[in-house]
């Protein structure tokens, strides 16, 4: 996730998608944008660039923004291309301070909350039903007040993998 504060009367963020936007519609990168810890956007990235309006008003304000990939990296990533701000602040965009604790989680699709938003346990895989913000990894980091990163690849666990249908214990 990328976190920063933005000060101004109007702010937007331009997001960029990678080659994952060319995946089938059920497997394009899924992302979320939060403003002051409230979910603003939860969407699948299907274009090379998307602009999200963070806020707009007459009074200047400071807001905390978080942009987070909710699906596995193997299905594509997103990045912040630009932050556009109308502001009188000398430094309108600043990174959020790092927390004392940083945890990196490495695992398979369960680490990215595979199927957590599916309607049934027999639903086929779709990035639309993965949501890292509901994963054990993210929730653990939140409880420990830690920053976190995750490396999550379907079928490629640390102990074993199931990418071909056969258990791999190499």
Regions found by a protein language model. Name each.
Residues 1-106, 110-129:
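N-terminal secretory targeting modules
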Residues 73, 116, 121-170:
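Conserved SGNH/GDSL esterase-like catalytic core that processes O-acyl groups on lipids
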């Amino acid at each position: 996730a990328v976190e920063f504060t933005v000060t101004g009367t109007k702010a937007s963020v331009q997001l960029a998608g990678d080659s994952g936007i060319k995946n089938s519609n059920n497997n394009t990168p899924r992302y979320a944008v939060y403003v002051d810890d409230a979910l603003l956007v939860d969407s699948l990235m299907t274009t090379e660039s998307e602009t999200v309006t963070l806020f707009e008003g007459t009074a200047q304000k400071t807001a905390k923004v978080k942009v987070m990939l909710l699906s596995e990296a193997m299905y594509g990533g997103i990045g912040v291309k630009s932050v556009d701000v109308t502001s009188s602040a000398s430094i309108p965009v600043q990174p959020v301070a790092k927390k004392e604790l940083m945890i990196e989680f490495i695992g398979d699709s369960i680490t990215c909350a595979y199927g957590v938003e599916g309607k049934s346990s027999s639903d086929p895989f779709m990035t639309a039903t993965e949501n890292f913000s509901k994963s054990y990894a993210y929730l653990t980091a939140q409880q420990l007040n830690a920053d976190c990163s995750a490396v999550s690849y379907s079928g490629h666990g640390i102990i074993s993998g199931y990418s071909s249908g056969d258990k791999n214990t190499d």
